[in-house]
Regions:
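Hydrophobic/aromatic residues within well-ordered alpha-helical segments
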Residues: 38, 45-49, 53, 111-115, ...
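Residues in soluble alpha-helical coiled-coils and helical-bundle/repeat scaffolds
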Residues: 36-40, 44, 62-65, 82-83, ...
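Amphipathic alpha-helical segments used for helix-helix packing
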Residues: 70, 82-106
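Helix-turn-helix
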Residues: 2-40, 44
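Hydrophobic/aromatic-rich alpha-helical bundle segments in the mid-to-C-terminal region
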Residues: 105-109, 113, 128-174, 181-199
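Solvent-exposed, amphipathic alpha-helical segments
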Residues: 2-10, 56-63, 90, 94, ...
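Recognition helices and adjacent regulatory flanks at domain boundaries
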Residues: 3-4, 18-19, 44, 48-50, ...
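Hydrophobic alpha-helical connector segments
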Residues: 44, 55-88, 140-144, 168, ...
Length: 199
């Protein structure tokens, strides 16, 4: 969507209806007639996000098959909007609006809740298919969402490698202890230290 693409390139202060119109290939008057204000345009763009979450997760399931692979790859793909520090800064600027403006906050809360619910479903499937140990999947879904957000901000500060690689490593690190046979798969140096600590 033209609005979403421009939000990655322009901050809320810099974004104009003319920018979005040019990206969409229409004249600004068309957007002014339809939306009236920039705020209304942004609200319209954001309102579609919560309802699209189940479909997004379903498409990823069909693509990757494995519940855990689906989870990791989908979170990585969804970080594409902030693949540069500049795009991340723009995203954080829009997040400020989401936290202050009640209408935007309601949409953001609904989107976050939908993502957490779909993440839990993937974790439930991962347990059922013996990819994960039995665990509190609701709590793990919460942790995944928190690690995802924290890792993205962490990467924007350290700027080592790509965001995709940084995020994948963070999510896999969180999930590692929950995998079946996790201790057996740990690096030898680490398992050696664990054995020495037991003596």
């Amino acid at each position: 969507m033209a609005t979403t693409r421009m939000m990655q390139r322009r901050s809320p202060v810099d974004l104009t209806l003319a920018d979005v119109a040019k990206e969409a290939g229409v004249v600004p008057a068309t957007l002014i007639q339809r939306f009236g204000t920039k705020r209304s345009l942004l609200l319209a763009a954001c309102r579609t996000a919560p309802g699209g979450v189940p479909e997004q997760f379903g498409a990823a399931r069909a693509k990757y098959g494995s519940p855990l692979k689906t989870l990791i790859e989908l979170y990585v793909e969804c970080s594409g909007f902030a693949s540069t520090p500049e795009a991340m800064a723009n995203g954080l600027a829009y997040l400020q609006i989401d936290l202050i403006d009640p209408e935007f906050h309601a949409i953001t809360l609904a989107q976050f809740t939908a993502i957490r619910d779909e993440t839990k479903k993937l974790l439930d499937d991962a347990v059922a298919s013996d990819e994960l140990k039995p665990c509190d999947t609701a709590d793990l879904a919460r942790l995944i969402q928190q690690v995802n957000g924290g890792a993205m901000l962490d990467w924007a500060v350290y700027r080592k490698g790509s965001l995709a690689a940084w995020l994948r490593r963070s999510l896999e690190g969180l999930l590692a202890p929950y995998r079946l046979g996790a201790e057996a798969d740990l690096p030898k140096a680490r398992t050696g230290r664990m054995q020495n600590n037991r003596r």
